[in-house]
From Swiss-Prot:
Biological role stated in the UniProt entry: While neither of the L31 paralogs is essential, this protein does not seem to function as the main L31 protein. Has a higher affinity for 70S ribosomes than the zinc-containing L31 paralog; is able to displace it to varying extents, even under zinc-replete conditions.
BP GO annotations: translation
Entry-linked NCBIfam families: L31, PRK01678.1
GO cellular component terms listed in the entry, alphabetical order: ribonucleoprotein complex; ribosome
Quaternary structure and interacting proteins, as annotated: Part of the 50S ribosomal subunit after the end of exponential growth.
Gene3D superfamilies in the record: Ribosomal protein L31
GO molecular function annotation: structural constituent of ribosome
Annotated protein name in UniProt: Large ribosomal subunit protein bL31B
Family: Belongs to the bacterial ribosomal protein bL31 family. Type B subfamily.
Organism annotation: Bacillus subtilis (strain 168)
Pfam families per record: Ribosomal_L31
Keywords, alphabetical: Ribonucleoprotein, Ribosomal protein
Gene (UniProt): rpmE2
Length: 82
């Protein structure tokens, strides 16, 4: 690999703006806003709109499409289904 062309990877705090949930991870993204983590160190804070704390797939509050597929909709529309 070439030297000096790869972005630096460092620890950052991701914060969900909807719930306030925070988690520590690594990223190439950085921020001017910083916060202290549970380990006593200060890390940049990246604000996200959706995280595993608020995403419907992870919370179990997802909606399923109850309309059926295209064939079922066609049959229903033209009274072809029995």
């Amino acid at each position: 690999m070439k030297e000096g062309i790869h972005p630096k990877n460092h620890k950052v705090i991701f914060q969900d703006v909807n719930s306030g949930y925070r988690f520590l991870s690594t990223s190439t993204k950085t921020s001017n806003e910083t916060a202290e983590w549970e380990d006593g160190n200060t890390y940049p804070v990246i604000k996200v709109e959706v995280s595993s704390d608020t995403h419907p797939f992870y919370t179990g509050r997802q909606k399923f499409n109850e309309k059926g597929g295209r064939v079922e909709q066609f049959k229903k529309r033209y009274n072809m289904g029995k």
